Amino acid sequence: METIVENGNGKTMEFCMKDPLNWEMASESMKGSHLDEVKNMVAEFRKPVVQLAGKTLTIGQVAAIAARDDGVTVELAEAAREGVKASSDWVMDSMNKGTDSYGVTTGFGATSHRRTKQGGALQKELIRFLNAGIFGNGTETSHTLPHSATRAAMLVRINTLLQGYSGIRFEILEAITKFLNTNITPCLPLRGTITASGDLVPLSYIAGLLTGRPNSKAVGPTGEKINAEEAFRLAGISTGFFELQPKEGLALVNGTAVGSGMASMVLYEANILAVLSEVISAIFAEVMNGKPEFTDHLTHKLKHHPGQIEAAAIMEHILDGSGYVKAAQKLHEMDPLQKPKQDRYALRTSPQWLGPQIEVIRSATKMIEREINSVNDNPLIDVSRNKALHGGNFQGTPIGVAMDNTRLAIASIGKLLFAQFSELVNDYYNNGLPSNLTGSRNPSLDYGFKGAEIAMASYCSELQFLANPVTNHVQSAEQHNQDVNSLGLISSRKTSEAVEILKLMSSSFLVALFQAVDLRHIEENVRLAVKNTVSQVAKRTLTTGVNGELHPSRFSEKDLLRVVDREYVFAYADDPCLTTYPLMQKLRETLVGHALDNGENEKDVNTSIFHKIAIFEEELKAILPKEVENARASVENGIPAISNRIEECRSYPLYKFVREELGTELLTGEKVRSPGEELDKVFTAMCEGKLVDPLLACLEAWNGAPLPIC
């Protein structure tokens, strides 16, 4: 079997013969659960060192370099030096021998028919004409690529060039690494690339800094704007600006690193948000008194889709043993024929809805992970066969397609969250929670999450618009040479916007869910107080007659307590004895029913139940409002009769983080604090990555499998 010699290092490899189509490798990469993959991603993100060798770069590592500008360093594998040098030497040798190679002795793109022997000057001109970006006089940051994305691009480009197929000196890669490690970031234009032939325009600004172009700018370690000379000094690069050798300019700019770097950042966030959406859906089921049957493993196994099966299993894990589920089961057992047999789609089909989105995001992650470990410039230098291969690996189609698909998945997740949020704040659907999740004693002066619901509609609308594909808007470019192009970075940028909006929606929904958790806590304590009060008043007023004899009305107590169990607390809590509210109406109806069944006894004032109704109501009105207020005050003062059920649930780590560590609280119209202030706390924490640990803590005990079918 013919073997291929790896460039310059003398070792043989059989990667062209073993698994020649790479489907086996792609299949192997999808083994295991999505959650395990996310955990590994987070672990990679938190490592203090990223070791680059060209073939093992991960999404988590790229995200770490992008976000952690002072907590992680990059190290280059010394073993790669020989291969890099071999391809660089080959270019110089071939140039000296008069070999005709694209971008080395020829012009570029549609003008590649031009020829020159001035290889260094050609590279210099390449960088000059590609410096075509617009920054708005350097003051408008909205036209500058985020520095995090630039750092990601630098890392990915180094990784590609380390593989030794690009014809560039190792010293240039070391210089870019020093920029990363000293937190010096070149300023790249936000727009201007079609990611085929690579990200030419933005990458040319990295090359411009390396070559000391006078228009090159960078941002220093403390955020200050610096020129190329200052950048080299701060980075400790003492060799001076680089004079590019033949092919080196092309090696720097002719790649997909900006698009794939930003895509890596986006996918790190998207994967975490996908897991969060699964946990959020389970919490939604808890506070909505949902039926957990929708997570049963057999249902999902029969559908076959792994994303759906895992989403259901994760929700099942959260709901297993949940106090809310147990309480809801008792609730559903009362008058079952008068209630819907099953929950609405936003709850009941959430695994079926989220599953495909998780599969899409996971597939996109693998696609981008392959891309950031690829050699994606042109021509490729094959030292072993003594030739330059002219192809099109610079075409960033995997990025554009992966990002379009990811953005559509993100929009679908957002749509589900909006549907769930809309049910949660609507008292027609939310099984007894107050309208708008108002937390005040006076609902007429508290409109709770009404503003947040409007904002959620806005977020969702923008997210649905962003779901439109980018890749079908290709324009023929560069004298019709680049007549099809990937638009990879544009799609990555739009997906980054979508991720930000999904964070806005997720943080808003989390605050609303935990408002609902606290309202359920109030509900449970108030119901207990009402039940005890009704029982006590019934015993005092309905048990005996005027002369102490047992009275027929004593048999009504059980039915009166059943009324309390059935009625929604927040339908009467602001004024429990108001006769137009359902509690007093139903209590009276119950006593009237007993009176009608009392027959001849009603003719005797001593045995009449009708005569007892007024006495019962009068005493209840004298006591109940105070008891309801005491119950609510006890919850607010941290001494409730019944503890908050969330404390025993697997979703508690998220609740605890949002309430205790972020310092959020139950929102009411009586307080000055606005919903936006609380939402901001959660959103900021989410952007800073602080939500990851409590999120994963909710699933710490999950063994990666559904509950057994019994």
From Swiss-Prot:
The EC number(s) this enzyme carries: 4.3.1.24
Enzyme class: lyase
Alphabetical list of Pfam families matching this protein: Lyase_aromatic
InterPro entries hit by this protein: Aromatic_Lyase, Fumarase/histidase_N, L-Aspartase-like, Phe/His_NH3-lyase_AS, Phe_NH3-lyase, Phe_NH3-lyase_shielding_dom_sf
Gene3D superfamilies (UniProt xref): Fumarase/aspartase (Central domain), Fumarase/aspartase (N-terminal domain), Phenylalanine ammonia-lyase 1, domain 3
Catalytic activity: L-phenylalanine = (E)-cinnamate + NH4(+)
Protein name listed in UniProt: Phenylalanine ammonia-lyase 1
Organism: Lithospermum erythrorhizon (Purple gromwell)
